Structures are given as C-alpha cells and as structure tokens.
From Swiss-Prot:
Oligomer status and interactors: Forms a heterotetramer with UvrA during the search for lesions. Interacts with UvrC in an incision complex.
The name this protein goes by in its record: UvrABC system protein B
Subcellular location: Cytoplasm
InterPro entries registered for this protein in UniProt: Helicase/UvrB_N, Helicase_ATP-bd, Helicase_C-like, P-loop_NTPase, UVR_dom, UVR_dom_sf, UvrB, UvrB_inter
Alphabetical list of Gene3D superfamilies matching this protein: P-loop containing nucleotide triphosphate hydrolases, UVR domain
GO biological process: nucleotide-excision repair; SOS response
Keywords, comma-separated and alphabetical: ATP-binding, Cytoplasm, DNA damage, DNA excision, DNA repair, Excision nuclease, Nucleotide-binding, SOS response
Gene name as annotated: uvrB
Segments forming domain Helicase ATP-binding: 24-409
GO cellular component assignments: cytoplasm; excinuclease repair complex
Predominant cellular place of this UniProt entry's protein: cytoplasm
Length: 656
C-alpha cells in the first residue's frame, strides 16, 4: 500500500515550497535536512505531505510522551487508511535495579507495565515487518534494546488453510510465543474448544483469529469480533506474531544458556578473593538460567540480551530502529531538545550498572542491555529531517546548508514582539496582567520562572487570590505531572508556572500571555533558542502577548528580538499581499470520549470533560460490565461496553 493523505485543507503559505524542497532532497538522497518552522506554521502537515510524496516507512521521533501522543493523534487523522503506530515506554511506573555501595543498599527493579501501550508497541513492530505504509511515532524508547527483529520474526507463526498443524504442537508453539491458554477472551491468550482454536493476538484488541480444523487439517481462518466471535473476514492465510519482543527460538535459547554459563565461570574466577560477591552472582545467575530453561523467560532477561543476539561485548543492542528497512525516513521533532536527550541516555544507564556489575549483582554482559550511544544512533540517520523552530548547531552542521524555512502561519498570526519590563516588582505587574486576561473567557497564561521554589511560591500566591494556578517542574512525579497537564487542557487551571515548560509541548490556542520572569539571567533556559521557543507559545492566539521581565538587554534577548521581528515581518508582508486577516485556531481541547445515545442521555446537559482519575475508573467499570455481559452471553451488550472502554482508553492515552 501507499500512504494516502487525508486533509480538509491544502498546503498554503510556505508549506508548498517546503514540501517540494524536502521531498526533492530525499529523492536526491540528501542525508540531512532541517525544517526550520515557526510554532503554528503547520510543520506536522508539511511532514505528512512529504511522507505521502516519498512513500517510505517513517519514524517520527519526539523527545517526550506528551509530544509523541499529540503527533500520533495528528498523523492518525492525516493517514486513516495507513498503519500509524505509537511506540513509547510501556512503564506506568519504573524503578530500575540499582546498588548503592556507600550504605550497602540494593534496590530491586520494580515496575508496572501499561497493557495498552504494550499492545501498541507490539502492533508497531508487527506493522513495520508487514507493510511499507507504516509511520511510527516514538519517544527515545526507540534506541533501547527490545530483542532482535530476526528472532522476533522467526518466532512468528504463519498459518495456511489446507495445511496440517497437529493441535497439541500448535498450542505448544503458541506458549513459546508468550501466549497463555485461557478461557477468558483477552489479548495474548488462546483457547481450544473441540475442533476450534481461538487466538487473541497480543497486538490487537479489536480482532480475534478463529481456526477451524478437520482432524489436524486447518479448514478455515476467520477474523472475528473478540467478544461475540462473529466473523468479520475469512482469509486463506495469516501470520501470528509473538506476545513479547524477547521471545527466541529454542536453539538460540540453548546457545544463550551455554554462553551465560561461560561468562559466569569467568566471573567466578574474577571474584575468587571476594566470596560475598562470588556467592551472590552465582546464585542469582544460576536461578535465572534455570528459569530460562524451564519457561524461556526470567526476571531481568533483558540483561542477558547479548547472549541471545550473539553479538560481541560492546556491540549496539537491537532496537526498534533495526526493524525498519534501510531506506526509511527519520523525522526528529523538536530536534534541539531530542538530540541532546539521545546523547544523555547512554551515560545515565552506564553509571547505574557499574555498581551492579562491580558488586556481583549482574554479569558484565548487563552493560549491553542499554540505549544506543549518540554515535551508534547516527548510523541510522540515512535520510533525516530535523524539525525545529530553533535548530541547534548539530542539526545545522549536519544539514550542510539544506535548511528549509517555514515562517508563514496559515492563520495569519504574526510572532508577538516581546515587551520588556523591569524585573523589579515583576510579580505584582504579572498579577495585574493575569487579572486582565482572566476577565476574558478561555484564556490561559504561562509563566516561566528561574527556579522551582519561585514557581511554587507564585502558584501559592495566586491560589490564595482564588486564581486557578499550578506549578510544574522536574520534582513532580510523572503521574501528578500528567494530571496537571490534563487539568490545564480541561480548563481546570488558568495559570501554569514552570521552569521549563518547553518540554511539555504546550501549544494551546487559548494561551494569550507568556511571561518570562528574570529574562536577563543568561543560561540554558534564557538562551536565544529558549526565548524564541517561549515566544512561540503565544503565537497561536490573535491577542498573544509576550513579556520579558528584565533589567537589562542580554545578548540572547537582543537576538530574540531581532529574529522575532524578522519572522513577524515575513508574516505581515504575506498577509498584506494575500489580503489575509489573522484568525485564531478554533480547536476543542477535549470532548467527552464516551459515546452518548438514547433519549435520556440526549436530554441531559453536556458533561464536562473527564479527568484522568475519572477516566481510569470508567475504564475499569466498562471492563467489568463487558466481562459480565460476555460471561452471560449478552454479546451485543458486551460489544457496546467494549467500544466505550476503547474510546475511554484512547482519551486516556491522549491525556497521558
């Protein structure tokens, strides 16, 4: 299949030229290009057009889950008939294994896996192996090891009508693929009923596979509704993919066990004069080997990944990037933040594992269960488009002059010129500006502070004045961060104060004021790049305004003013030449995801959007009702609850 772009609008402004240049660059095998696009200029739409033009498997890399979720939703709308997939960390909670030598404290790995995201990850790898019209939106999880595509593909099970498959052997093979025999219809399971085997793929929630046999001959394959098992399609063949990225063929597993034992013997000699470490490593590793022999799996199996892939020590791990063909297109969104993040991943992982290996908790091969280094990741940059309003030196150097500007916004809204006010008395002045905007409906304010403490103090000060305010910084747990961002989008918060709000992807049309406190304190978050990015947060609103609270004009402020004026003039000239009046983006933040039906519901007043906690409760409620209805053979009713649960999960995924 080819990529089929669906949009209710055509490219305009700078977009047609940007699309043409980027497309031609890829066709001419230009390795690196930069799309320098202002906030609100439609960069995602431009990339979607390029993807449709070049028709290659595509990986879009975002620097956090929030941005990845936004991009995933947008690309799904642009390519409804293609495989748009989502690949991020599937941990709702993750405490990595660690050892603190100074106080002899071992911290065992603790985690909570999000089943829905696990399904999406498996769906992503299935799609990229099966079809070229695949676009995967990913966080930096794509550079972490997940098991080799060769092992994963070799464990896939191809079934054809008319061929013989002894059912006992088929069931055993499904177990090896990480499927469980269960009477309950849920993903990663299968069930046998007479001459029928129903399989519920690990990467699907809307489709089951029903196999019917005559003796051991496969007589039919039907795709079915997983609740009602009513057939939706009949096919001559199908492929069932494993329920985990870490499954391996038996021969590979046996070879890996031998290799692990050899490394263990070497390490026993290393610890000959350290009996505590020697005993600890021997018992831990021996237990893991026995688990792998018996079940094909053990806790922390990823630490032995090198033995399964037969790679030499220090070799890069197999990751999502290895699942793509060589001619894939890589799009790095917000590259000025994403590239530094890729650089940082390896160093953080290495420092944690050093003490685990040194004190006998892990074999040295655990070092190879890691993210790629930046240099290793670069080897996959065959055709890459860096996307940013403020690209860094790395991207500019790599692109060797292949820089495509996209300054003009389809909305006609020019960049707001930052107003500079004294830093002395900045909080009182800010309060007055906030009150002006809160007298208007639906307007939001972003405040950028210089420290976490100041963000907390301002939020407390505003809250005492009955202003709906909250602070956001790195000290807040992920779950709470998610809730705060959701409340901002849902309208429960009017003012958000933070130190680095750029990382949150807050491009809201409702933001009419961005205030940067202590803007003259030169540093990472007061650099030219950061200041321009902050200004862009107000460029989606016709009334958008930016205030720099500064007692002096720093070099970064001067460069920001110069670049902002340049971009503003380009937009104004375009508006004048094309008789365009700036207009705001009309976009609903969130709608109630639960389908409404029936006379009674239609007469109820419109419900306010649901919070994350409310959605989680609702999902659990619908899941229980669905299972209860299915157990009582009320399949039509169960299907309705299934659809409601799916809609709620999609909304929760977007909020998260």
């Amino acid at each position: 299949m080819t990529f089929e772009l669906r949009a209710a609008f055509a490219p305009c402004g700078d977009q047609p030229e940007a699309i043409a240049k980027l497309t031609q660059g890829i066709r001419n095998d230009v390795q690196s290009q930069v799309l320098l696009g202002t906030t609100g200029s439609g960069k995602t739409f431009t990339i979607a057009n390029v993807v449709a033009n070049v028709n290659r498997p595509t990986l879009v890399l975002a620097h956090n889950k929030t941005l990845a979720a936004q991009l995933y939703q947008e690309f799904k709308e642009f390519f409804p008939n293609n495989a748009v997939e989502y690949f991020i960390s599937y941990y709702d909670y993750y405490q990595p294994e660690a050892y603190i030598a100074r106080n002899d404290t071992y911290i065992e790995k603790s985690l909570l896996i999000n089943s829905e995201i696990d399904k999406l990850r498996l769906s992503a790898t299935r799609s990229i192996l099966e079809r070229r019209d695949t676009l995967i939106v990913s966080s930096v999880s794509c550079i972490y090891g997940i098991g080799s595509p060769e092992n994963y593909a070799s464990m896939a099970l191809e079934l054809k009508v008319g061929k013989e498959y002894p059912r006992t052997l088929l069931a055993a093979q499904l177990v090896k693929m990480n499927y469980q025999a269960s009477p309950v219809a849920q993903r990663s399971t299968f069930r046998e009923r007479g001459s029928v085997i129903d399989i519920f793929p690990a990467y699907e929630s809307d489709q089951a596979i029903r196999l019917e046999f005559f003796n051991d001959t496969l007589s039919s394959i039907e795709y079915s509704d997983p609740l009602t098992m009513i057939p939706t399609a009949s096919v001559a063949s199908t492929i069932i993919y494993p329920g985990s990225h870490y499954v391996t063929p038996e021969a590979v597993r046996e070879q890996a066990i031998c290799s692990i034992r050899e490394e263990l013997e070497e390490r026993m000699l290393f610890f000959h004069d350290r009996p505590v470490e020697q005993d600890r490593l021997f018992h831990r590793t021996t237990h893991d080997i026995e688990m792998i022999k018996e079940t094909g799996f053990c806790k922390g199996i990823e630490n032995y990944s090198r033995h399964f892939t037969k790679m030499p020590p220090g070799a890069p791990p197999a990751c999502l990037l290895d699942y793509f063909p060589e001619d894939f297109l890589l799009v790095i969104d917000e590259s000025h933040q994403t590239l530094p993040q890729i650089r940082a991943m390896y160093r953080g992982d290495l420092s944690r594992k050093q003490s685990l290996v040194e004190y006998g908790f892990r074999l040295p091969s655990a070092y190879d269960n890691r993210p790629l280094t930046y240099e290793e990741a670069q080897k996959y940059f065959h055709n890459v488009i860096y996307v940013s309003a403020t690209p860094g030196e790395t991207e500019l150097n790599e692109s060797q002059g292949h820089i495509v500007e996209q300054i003009i916004r389809p909305t006609g809204i020019p960049d707001p010129i930052p107003e500079i006010r004294p830093a002395t008395g900045q909080v009182d002045d800010l309060l007055e500006e906030i009150r002006k905007r809160l007298s208007k409906s639906q307007e939001k304010i972003l405040v950028i502070s210089i420290t976490k403490k100041l963000a907390e103090d301002i939020a407390a000060f505003l809250s005492e004045l009955d202003i709906a305010a909250a602070y956001l910084h790195s000290g807040i747990e992920t779950a709470e961060r998610t809730r705060i961002l959701a409340d901002l989008r849902l309208g429960n918060i009017d003012v958000l104060i933070g130190v680095n709000l750029l990382r949150e992807g807050l491009d809201l049309p409702e933001v009419s004021l961005v205030a940067i406190l202590d803007a003259d304190k030169e540093g990472f978050l007061r650099s030219t790049s950061s200041l321009i990015q902050f200004c862009g947060r107000a460029a989606r609103n016709v009334e958008g305004k930016v205030i720099f609270y500064a007692d002096q004009k720093t070099r970064s402020i001067e460069q920001t003013l110069k670049e902002t004026e340049r971009r503003r003039q380009i937009q104004l000239d375009y508006n004048k030449a094309n008789n365009i009046t700036p207009k705001p983006i009309i976009k609903a933040i969130f709608a109630n995801p639960i389908p409404q039906g029936g006379k009674k519901e239609s007469q109820e007043p419109a419900k306010t959007p649901l919070s994350i906690k409310e959605l989680e409760k609702l999902i659990k409620k619908f899941e229980n009702l669905m299972q209860e209805a299915a157990h009582e053979f009320r399949f039509d009713e169960a299907a309705k609850y299934r659809d409601k649960m799916k809609a709620a999960k999609e909304q929760l995924l977007y909020l998260s």
